[in-house]
Amino acid sequence: MNILPITDPAFRKYGRVINNVDLTELYDVMRTTPVPEGVVYEPSIEALEALPAMKALSTVTYGEMPIQIGYCNGHNSLLNAVEYHRSSEINAAATDAILVVGMQQDIEDDLTYDTAKMEAFLLPANTAVEIYATTLHYAPCGVNGAGFQVAIVLPRGTNYPLEETHAGLDAVAAKNEDPLLAATNKWLIGHAEGGLDASAHIGLKGKNLNVNE
């Protein structure tokens, strides 16, 4: 799979590098967090939210909105699914990582998406990017099989269990995105080979992308 640097102009439609906030301490603390054999995501970690980066990112990057800082760590080389939010997400990498991204605008009317349209970018250690709200993404991937540690910043309350019942694919509302809603502020399309929960909408067409191929 062709992997471009995060500074390549091709990334501009997906996000931008953040260089106006000091995240040194965030990277340092992130390097003390666990790196399992699989992938673990924690939406909110007290030790990360106690750092100066919490206020700086809330004030500068999110325009004084309340935010949460967690992490996505582990070992991974596969796409498995794509998701998007109603807001930008910040990925702050304590290690090298690969981001596989696409465009929400390319989701078909039947709520499917062709993975051949996705691109991969290398996010170097000690680098943070804003991933725009319309950018399809999922868990980062490691470089050459190595583990990764990436802090994940989102508006507070994102990625928690839903409280309401939402429309299924056979509902009148299926023309909209409601069947994709998998958690608060999280719309998801899974791949049949992604090992997702049975409740996930499976709509990715094409290969379950592998960054090592």
Give, region by region, the residue ranges found by the protein language model.
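Histidine-centered metal-chelating micro-motifs
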Residues: 127-129, 134-138
